[in-house]
Curated annotation (Swiss-Prot):
TM ranges: none
Bridged cysteine pairs (disulfide): none
PANTHER family cross-referenced by the UniProt entry: CHROMOSOME 5 OPEN READING FRAME 34, ZGC:153352
Name the UniProt record assigns to this protein: Uncharacterized protein C5orf34 homolog
InterPro entries from the UniProt entry: C5orf34-like (IPR053901), C5orf34-like_2nd (IPR053899), C5orf34-like_C (IPR027865), C5orf34-like_dom (IPR053900), C5orf34-like_N (IPR027830)
Native organism taxonomy: Eukaryota, Metazoa, Chordata, Craniata, Vertebrata
Length: 639
């Protein structure tokens, strides 16, 4: 089946993907990658109320009609995902590799060595691991880098290879145990699988003092023998390509990236001194003796089946809006990580603030700059044009007009980036609190309540409104006129002077009006809403200036559990008391006495004090008298 080309591909923070095609069709990929939903475009003559055809399938069992589209969507996901999803059934044969060993980490040269380091005439530095299972490429611009590594394909939950066991071992035993890890994928009964619960799918960078050849089998007691390496014992690996920003490098690639940056500086310094320095070469170490190496644990592929498929969320577009591809760019309530739109890549980072980088495709890059990220963009030309063109800074409020013959439109690129930043600002200022819950992050035995934020501080200011602060640095204020303000503010402690005005550094706050409409307002220039923003910021500054003992940063799980149970029981007791004493239900006297006795025996003292029985009884008595008067008037009017 022929399919139109992709127009927009969006990767969200939970690693879910949305793909929009030129024909109007859409493809959604679950965060774990194990399931997808394809929504076909409706013809122009279709009735507006007719729903489009939707196909929902498991990724591992995709039919041939959607195989190519799903493969490109998975490649886009795996290029920037925390954990790749690699289904053996849809990976091309040229990207597969059968290996007789099971490995989950690679060794890199140390900082004082230049082994396995290459650079080309174009200025690209290539760092290759000692075992050849991964390599990193850093271009001369040094804004982003790509990494290629071998990753074991996704396995079924009941059959997986031997996992890394180096976490519970001594450093001396790690090197010996690493040489014993021979893959036996065909017979799991001969293995001893040990995997810690709640272990993250990837580990941080580790260091070792010596390199070990993982292709051999070693046993200090002389009892180790190579097993029969037949076809059933081979592990299937696939090459994965990822692209990351140098400013937001994952832990696993920090050492090879630092090695590439250090080596590039050496090459540039040598070329300035010696004009005859070769433009491309392979540089080896001057000292042949063995030296220390660095070990990175590779990202581990997710399972073929999702552990929590009930958490998959699908967005269904309106049939009228679906005919307008640019009507709604981001309908998924999640932070955006990467956007590919008509050949241009937008890469975002979400640490303390939302920052974005734009890669038009010609080697140049735009970066959001300024006190409020997103108000200014700095243009860095490509390396070939760096001698002719200088760096420029553009303001969002004063963009230059488009010039004929340019490779791209600066105005359209920055406007698109601004829309992405505004979407992320709305998500960060949302009170849904569910964007951190993800299906592949839900380990067995982990409660969702431990992930959701907790109320840290609540204040009721007379004549102003109610202010609340949560553990996820989110502040919510409800004013007496019905206007609500939400912003982010760092509440960890007053010792961090640099982040006292974290809400201001974010640059935006969200106002919700009584009619339900909301609007993003810059905190530095709120305009007509200055009194709302100023009141919230003043209250936040008062919180950061208090002692850490007065503002708790977190609650223990036991305290949170007791607090939630007590509050729910109190609500149930109040509801039961009001129901039994309001006379709404015509219960028998015996049942009323039994229920009232049960309530009194439970918590009569605290309950009567909380609800104030006398006021409730007086109000009910007056209500009954009014109803009797109404009945009398109705009876008299009928006569």
């Amino acid at each position: 089946m022929g399919m139109a080309a992709e127009v927009r591909m969006v990767l969200y923070e939970d690693d879910s993907v949305q793909v929009h095609y030129a024909c109007g069709s859409t493809l959604q990929l679950s965060p774990c990658g194990s399931e997808f939903l394809f929504e076909k475009a409706l013809p122009p003559s279709t009735h507006p109320l007719e729903q489009p055809e939707r196909i929902r399938q498991r990724t591992h069992f995709v039919i041939s009609n959607y195989r190519e589209q799903l493969q490109r969507a998975l490649d886009f996901r795996n290029s920037s995902a925390t954990c790749p999803f690699l289904s053996e059934s849809i990976i091309p044969p040229e990207r597969k590799k059968h290996i007789f060993i099971d490995f989950s980490e690679v060794e890199w040269p140390s900082l004082d060595r230049d082994d396995c380091i290459m650079y080309s005439e174009s200025g690209v530095v290539k760092i290759t691991s000692l075992d050849g299972h991964a390599y990193l490429c850093l271009p001369r611009s040094q804004h982003e880098f790509t990494v290629h590594f071998l990753c074991k394909v996704s396995q079924r939950p009941d059959s997986s290879g031997i996992l890394s066991e180096t976490q519970n071992q001594d450093p001396k035993n790690k090197l010996v145990e690493k040489t014993r890890k021979v893959c036996r994928c065909g017979n799991l009964s001969e293995q001893t699988l040990r995997n810690k619960e709640n272990e993250p799918p990837y580990q941080i960078l580790k260091s070792k003092n010596a390199s070990v050849n993982t292709c051999c089998v070693n046993d200090s007691e002389g009892r180790g023998e190579l097993p029969s390496l037949g076809t059933n014992h081979r592990c299937v690996y696939a090459w994965v390509k990822q692209a990351w920003s140098v400013a937001a490098c994952p832990e696993a690639w920090k050492h090879p990236l630092s090695l590439a940056l250090r080596f590039y500086n050496k090459v540039r310094a040598a070329s300035e001194i010696d004009a005859d320095f070769p433009a491309s070469s392979i540089v080896t170490s001057d000292c042949p003796e063995e030296r220390g190496t660095e070990v990175s644990v590779l990202p581990r592929a997710l399972l073929l089946s999702c552990p929590a498929p009930h958490m998959h969320r699908w967005t269904f577009c309106d049939s009228l809006l679906q005919r307008q591809p640019d009507a709604e760019d981001f309908s998924y309530p999640e932070l955006v990580k990467v956007v590919w739109y008509k050949g241009v890549t937008y890469r975002l980072t979400h640490k303390n603030v939302n920052s974005i980088e734009i890669f038009p495709g010609d080697g140049s890059v735009f970066k959001s700059e300024g006190a409020h990220f997103g108000n200014y963009f700095t243009y860095y030309p490509s390396q070939e044009e760096s001698e002719k063109r200088e760096e420029k800074t553009y303001s969002v409020n004063n963009l230059p007009p488009d010039r004929p013959g340019n490779f791209f439109s600066v105005r359209s690129l920055i406007k698109q980036a601004t829309r992405i930043l505004q979407h992320c600002a709305k998500i960060r200022l949302s009170l849904s609190h569910n964007y951190r819950v993800c299906c592949w992050k839900m380990a067995p035995g982990v409660s969702v309540s431990t992930i959701l934020p907790v109320l840290l501080k609540e204040s009721l200011i007379p004549g102003v409104g109610r202010f609340l602060a949560y553990s996820d640095d989110k502040v919510h204020a409800v004013f007496l006129d019905g206007v609500t303000v939400t912003l982010n503010w760092h509440l960890s402690s007053s010792a961090e002077k640099k982040q006292v005005d974290q809400g201001l550094s974010f640059g935006w706050c969200r106002l919700t009006f009584p009619d339900g409409q909301d609007q993003l307002i810059p905190t530095e220039h709120p305009g007509a809403y200055e009194r709302y923003v100023t009141s919230v910021i003043s209250w936040c500054r008062g919180l950061t200036q208090t002692s850490p003992r007065q503002v708790p940063t977190h609650l223990s799980p036991a305290l949170k559990e007791n607090w939630s149970v007590a509050s729910e029981l109190e609500k149930i007791q109040k509801f039961n008391w009001l129901l039994e004493n309001s006379g709404v239900l015509n219960l028998t006297s015996s049942k009323n006495e039994q229920c009232s006795g049960h309530c009194k025996s439970g918590s009569s003292e605290t309950l009567l004090e909380a609800t104030n029985e006398e006021r409730v009884s007086v109000a009910l008595k007056r209500t009954s008298e009014i109803l009797q008067d109404i009945d009398r008037l109705l009876s008299l009017s009928r006569k």
